[in-house]
Amino acid sequence: MSSTTSPKSVLAEPVEALSFFARLKKKAALRQAQGGRLLLAAASVLAFATPATAQTVAITGGRVVIGDGGDPIDGGTVIIRDGRVVAAGAGVAVPAGAQVIDATGKWVTPGLMSGFSRIGLAEVDADGDSNDTSASTSPFNASLDIAPAINPAVSAIAVNRAAGVTRAVVAPSAANSIFAGQGAVIDLGGDADAITRRRAFQYVELGETGGVRAGGSRVSAHALLRNALREAGQVRAPAGTPADPRTIEPAQERAGDVMLTRFDATALIPVVRGQQALMVHVERASDILQALALKEEFPRLKLIIVGATEGWRVAAQLRAANVPVIANALNDLPASFEQLAATQSNVGRMRAAGVQVAIGQLNEDETRQLRVMNQAAGNLVALTRIPGATGLSWGQAFAAISSGPAAAVGMDDEIGSLRPGRRGDVVIWDGDPLELATGVEAVWIDGVQQSLENRQTRLRDRYRNPQEGALPHAYSPRD
């Protein structure tokens, strides 16, 4: 028989203790299904989590949002089994023995995904020793891989998880070169294994910032980028091998005037071969066109344009090139000379032209505030009601913070929606997720329900009803 619980009562269950082991178990199963290898040390831990892993969850009666741009489905059902979405929509049968959660009057959606962030790389920006967003004095650039620096315990991860964010694209910051290194896609689960895909893309700065990093001008930045890709193309490495300098033949001679180290050149091999995306940050329309022109010499490049404040001016070219864009939702100020044509209608105009657009948190003061992305998406919906402005439909706006970012990094077959086979990242809301007053009631990542507790809720609870003379002397996250 199935058991029935409301979202509120589900939250009262002791989910935190199970999440760590259950999510490790499910991640191991997911990786095995994809041909991955399970570490022996992890396997010994996973033996304790078998009961939680076998659970099937049925969320019934809610307003279901698939996340693919379509309209919400009233009275829908979502089935999660073994960490994956099995079915979602109307008329879905509830499997025998499933834990049934009544979501009547609630909204049920895929977890939110940020198309660009730096979450997990720093707790406090001002503390340089613990800030891993950039490597200003490193001898390496393109070969840098941010995955080892991701810290799942930073407070921002739990805070954003409680707001319905389940995945994020995390990019490094360029410091002494146009190449910042290789970014990752992570989950915001409450365990020690946050990496969904490491080396998901190579991040490059062009435009004004790229010019500064390359020696003072855009001319230098483009010369450096093209030369780097040419050098990588000349390196002999077996096809299909990972980006590892050890794949280069030891006896291979490289020209004496090469600019890249063996490590950086090898890291760019997958980029030239089209096996790893090249994420390029540009804002100005002419800079976007120059980035697109790279495909003339390097036709296998899988470009992703980030920023694109003036993307609406070259939307036709972006669509023709079939290049996805990750943009700030509402940039409308000429903050620099490369953003003079900024407009809040940028995302809407690009989408209307057929460009695949996702929303990210690009401004330095918001790269860890992922929880505001649904507010930004809601504002894009509101723009459709303003004469002369171009926004997004509700379905398009939600897709821009769910399946859109996943598609941009080539992972929409794994995450970002409630289509069958996707990872079980599901959120129950008490109302429209694009409305400011709406709150999160429950979150699942990889099919495991997550704790919504975080540093902010602990502070709230501790000081909600203070008594005179009874205030603690200091706050400890372990209390």
Outline where the language-model segments fall.
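His/Asp/Glu-enriched, well-ordered alpha-helical/loop segment
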Residues: 124, 131-137, 142-143, 277, ...
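C-terminal cap of metal-dependent C-N hydrolases
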Residues: 62, 66, 71-76, 407, ...
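Divalent metal-coordination and catalytic microenvironments
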Residues: 62, 78, 83, 105, ...
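Histidine-rich, glycine-flanked metal-binding segment
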Residues: 64, 68-109
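Intrinsic disorder/low-complexity segments
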Residues: 1-51
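Polyanionic/metal-chelating signatures
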Residues: 156, 161-302, 439, 474-479
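Glycine- and charge-enriched low-complexity intrinsically disordered segments
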Residues: 454-479
